[in-house]
C-alpha cells in the first residue's frame, strides 16, 4: 500500500467512527474560531501563496467542475436538462446520479442512459475554472490530485501530472473484475450514442463486453459499480505518494478546491495531516459552502468561502496585475 493510500485509509476510519457528524454536514475536528480576512485580502494572499510556494498540490473535487457548469449530478437544473433532457422529461430524475440508481427495465435502456452520461463528460469542453487554475499554475511545479471522474484535468495535463484516485470516465473495466485490465471507453460510447440517436436504448449487440469473460463491462469509476482497485488504481496512489514525499521538505501549498461532505477522506483530511506534518507546508481551500479549517492549521491555512469560479477568476486577474504582497 502506498503512502497516500494509507492516509486515506486512516481518515476513512475516522469517517466511520463519526459517521453521524459527517452525515449532518459537520466534522469531528476542532475548527478555528479565528475570523476570516476580508475577501480582497484573501485573494491577495492566495496569489502570494501560489507565487511563493516551491510547489503546489491541487486537490480538485466535484465543486470545481460544478462551478464551471458541470453541476448536473445532483439537481434537475438547466445543465441537467441540457444534456439529459429526454430522461428528465420521461423519468423525472433529480440529476444524473439519480438515473444511475434507477432500476431499468432492460440492459439496453440502462446502457442508453450510461452512454449519454459518459458522452456528456468525455466530450465536455474545458470549463472556465480549470482554465483559470491553469493560468495560476503557469510556471509552477505542481501536481493534481482529484476525485473527479469527468476527465477535465487530463484534458489539460499529461497523465503523469494527475492522480485520478476515484477512476476515469474514459475507461471500461470488467463489471465482475475478472481481469485487471482496463480499456478504452471513448470510442464505444461515441458509437452507442450515434447508434441510439433520439431513442433511449442502445442496440443489444453494442452493450460493452469484457474481452476476457464476455460479461458486461462497466466504467472504471467508484460510486455505483464494482470498482477495480488494480494496477491502474495503484498507479494513481503511487504518483501522488511519490510527489508529496519527494517535496515534503519544500514549501508546498496544498490547494483544495470544492471538497464536499461525502468524501472528505480522499483529499481534505489527508491534506490536513500533511500540512501539519510537513514543516513548510501551507493550506488554502476554496469552498462555496463549508468553512472547515482545523484549529491546528489556523496559522498555516485559510479557507475562502465563495464561488470557486469567482475566486479563480479574481485570483487570475490579480496575478495578472503582478499580484499583491499585502
Predicted regions and their residues:
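Conserved catalytic alpha/beta core of Sir2/sirtuin-type deacylases, generalized to analogous enzyme cores
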Residues: 2-326
Amino acid at each position: 500500500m502506498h503512502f497516500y493510500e494509507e492516509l486515506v485509509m486512516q481518515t476513512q476510519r475516522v469517517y466511520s467512527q463519526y459517521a453521524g457528524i459527517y452525515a449532518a454536514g459537520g466534522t469531528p475536528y476542532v475548527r478555528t474560531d479565528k475570523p476570516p480576512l476580508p475577501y480582497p485580502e484573501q485573494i491577495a494572499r492566495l496569489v502570494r501563496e501560489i507565487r511563493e510556494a516551491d510547489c503546489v498540490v491541487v486537490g480538485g473535487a466535484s465543486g470545481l467542475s460544478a462551478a464551471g457548469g458541470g453541476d448536473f449530478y445532483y439537481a434537475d437544473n438547466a445543465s441537467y436538462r441540457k444534456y439529459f433532457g429526454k430522461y428528465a422529461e420521461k423519468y423525472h430524475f433529480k440529476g444524473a446520479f439519480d438515473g444511475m440508481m434507477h432500476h431499468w427495465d432492460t440492459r439496453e435502456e440502462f446502457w442508453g442512459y450510461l452512454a449519454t452520461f459518459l458522452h456528456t463528460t468525455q466530450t465536455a469542453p474545458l470549463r472556465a475554472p480549470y482554465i483559470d487554475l491553469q493560468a495560476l499554475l503557469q510556471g509552477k511545479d505542481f501536481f493534481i490530485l482529484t476525485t473527479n471522474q469527468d476527465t477535465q484535468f487530463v484534458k489539460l495535463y499529461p497523465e503523469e501530472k494527475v492522480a485520478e484516485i476515484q477512476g476515469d470516465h474514459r475507461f471500461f473495466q470488467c463489471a465482475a473484475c475478472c481481469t485487471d485490465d482496463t480499456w478504452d471507453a471513448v470510442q464505444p460510447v461515441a458509437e452507442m450514442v450515434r447508434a441510439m440517436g433520439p431513442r433511449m436504448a442502445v442496440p443489444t449487440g453494442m452493450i460493452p463486453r469484457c474481452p476476457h469473460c464476455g460479461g458486461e463491462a462497466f466504467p472504471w469509476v467508484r460510486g455505483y459499480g464494482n470498482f477495480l482497485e488494480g494496477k491502474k488504481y495503484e498507479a494513481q496512489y503511487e504518483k501522488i505518494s511519490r510527489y508529496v514525499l519527494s517535496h515534503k521538505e519544500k514549501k508546498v501549498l496544498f490547494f483544495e478546491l470544492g471538497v464536499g461532505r461525502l468524501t472528505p477522506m480522499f483529499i481534505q483530511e489527508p491534506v490536513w495531516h500533511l500540512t501539519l506534518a510537513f514543516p513548510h507546508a501551507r493550506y488554502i481551500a476554496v469552498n462555496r459552502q463549508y468553512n472547515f479549517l482545523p484549529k491546528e492549521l489556523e496559522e498555516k491555512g485559510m479557507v475562502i468561502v465563495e464561488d470557486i469560479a469567482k475566486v479563480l477568476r479574481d485570483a487570475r486577474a490579480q496575478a495578472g496585475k503582478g499580484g499583491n504582497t499585502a
